[in-house]
Amino acid sequence: KLCLAGATAVALNAAPVAVFAKDEPLKVAFVYVSPANEEGWSSQHDIARKFVEEKFGDKIKVTWIENIPENADAQRVIRDLAQQGNKIIFATSFGYMNSVMKVAKQFPNVYFEHATGYKTSKNVKNYTARFYEGRYLAGMLAAATTKTNILGYVAALPIPEVFQGINAYTLGARAVNPNIEVRVVWTSSWYDPGKEADATKALIGMKADVITHHTNSTAVASTCEEAKVPVISYNSAMHKAAPTMLLGGVVHR
């Protein structure tokens, strides 16, 4: 499990003393790329948000905004949050990286935490986790389950984090069965339930009989449930979406 709540609390605890200097609450903001109430990447961040609100109480005032695409809207929203007096902003999706870097230059006294990125500055830091460890184990589980030796993988965008997951999953699977083939279908979006469902159906059509994903909705899990195909979830456990076909999940908490 990735401990997002712990990472978020550490980021707040590590904030410069000057940020906490005033008597008024520290203003903190979270920006999500998908709905906060649907199991997935954003919902796990929202669990972290609730955790830090409980931990810090009236010492902080938290704002969160969901469904912000990775385009000019992200830069506008992040800038607005900085202008509103937020001193720490969590930009929780890879594609927010350039927007964060641009806004950070304009607000040197605001601290930005960017998920899974690689660009930094004096007031921009990154956070990530060893996702590949869970992926490797998930691959082993899938290889022990498949009968066709074909595994399906619904992937969002061709970025290092996603390739890392695919590679780890494949290595884990081939540690159990060297004849495993992993077939990947791309959705070109972190959150598009329709495309995720279509990608899942396409993989089933390719004879993939165990499927996993690196996307943000429950569509892969629910589609596998309908098709009676075993699924390994990502981000959240997704028991409700696939109550009978869920093999396990790489869960971020």
Give the residues covered by each predicted segment.
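Generic alpha-helical secondary-structure signal
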Residues: L2-A5, V77
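Aromatic-residue hotspot detector
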Residues: K1-L2, F112
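C-terminal segment of classical bacterial N-terminal signal peptides
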Residues: C3, V10-V19
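Long alpha-helical scaffolds
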Residues: A7-A9, A208
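A residue-level marker of the well-folded mature domains of exported/periplasmic proteins
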Residues: F20-R253
